[in-house]
A protein has these predicted regions:
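Extended glycan-interaction surfaces of carbohydrate-active proteins
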Residues: 131, 260-292
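Basic side chains
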Residues: 3, 149, 246, 274-276
Length: 292
């Protein structure tokens, strides 16, 4: 209860200071930032599941591009010395989107349109496609692709999940080539209670990786960052299933212990405090434990 009250007050102060000029409360209790002239701006959001926690340091640069660094924490992968801070923690700035190809070309000239928080971080951007900064021979910059990124922790698995939806905004068909990427890191064995840990940052793409999208059509692929110890195996993520599980968890939290007042800012601050207090419960070897 004490943590819930503390989070409630903190989020209320945040909403009061920043919400009027940047974040707008939506009918579904989420908050959304429609990107205008108030950039650059940077912030962070902490989220968690039973076996992973993350701090997403995100923002919009002065040129309208998205900025992201992920801090990922695995509370059950213990490091040495095994004290209260001994969770395996790593930062990642890998750009899975940079490997995507549209008509054999990369995406250029990103302009972030909106950022939404609702227990997930959702970013909607528009891109051009072309040779020189999105143009051929100095042609006009015309948005061709809408890209929606969603970042969220798995509810019950040791991984951070990412969901990418590519939509054709143009009038002509485009060929989209999805990337197969897998990067593996191995920690030093003398730094872990259980020896060396394996970290994997990879895209999640089905058997088909080339798609022809007509006007208004879209395709979705995923990515994940996970870690495991000896005796465990790498997970094969189902990003859509993980997305649904996270959504269901948020809905359950928001529908229980509701706070109603004439002030929508108070109601929203309480709703987000409930998420943070409920999600930071980890499934340790000694049972469920509420993280600090």
């Amino acid at each position: 209860i004490a943590k819930l009250v503390f989070l409630f007050v903190g989020l209320l102060l945040f909403c009061e200071m920043d919400g009027q000029s940047r974040w707008q409360i939506q009918p579904d209790q989420s908050i959304e930032w429609s990107i205008g002239q108030n950039i650059p701006h940077y912030d962070h959001i902490e989220m968690g599941g039973e076996m992973v926690a993350t701090v997403l340091r995100y923002g919009v640069n002065a040129d309208g591009t998205f900025s992201l660094e992920r801090s990922v924490v695995w509370p059950m992968l213990r490091t040495i010395p095994n004290d209260t801070h001994a969770s395996l923690t790593r930062r990642f700035s890998v750009d899975f989107l940079a490997m995507l190809q549209v008509n054999g070309l990369t995406l250029n000239n990103e302009q972030v349109k909106s950022i939404r928080l609702d227990g997930k971080l959702t970013v909607v951007s528009e891109f051009t496609v072309g040779h020189t900064r999105g143009t051929k021979a100095g042609g006009e910059l015309v948005p061709a692709i809408e890209l929606t990124r969603v970042f969220f922790p798995s509810v019950d698995k040791p991984m951070l999940c990412e969901r990418y939806t590519v939509k054709n905004m143009g009038n002509e068909k485009v060929e989209v080539l999805l990337p197969h990427s897998r990067v593996v890191y191995q920690t030093k064995s003398d730094q872990g209670v259980d020896g060396s840990y394996t970290l994997v940052a990879s895209t999640v793409v089905g058997k088909e990786d080339v798609f022809l999208l007509g006007s208004g059509e879209s395709i979705t692929f995923g990515a994940s960052i996970q870690a495991y110890k000896r005796g465990q195996t790498e997970l094969l993520p189902n990003i859509d299933a993980e997305f649904s599980s996270r959504d269901n968890f948020i809905k359950q939290v928001w529908n229980n212990l509701d706070f109603c007042s004439p002030d929508t800012t108070l109601n929203t601050a309480f709703a987000f405090a409930k998420i943070r207090a409920s999600e930071s419960i980890y499934r340790t070897s000694g049972g469920l434990m509420h993280g600090p």
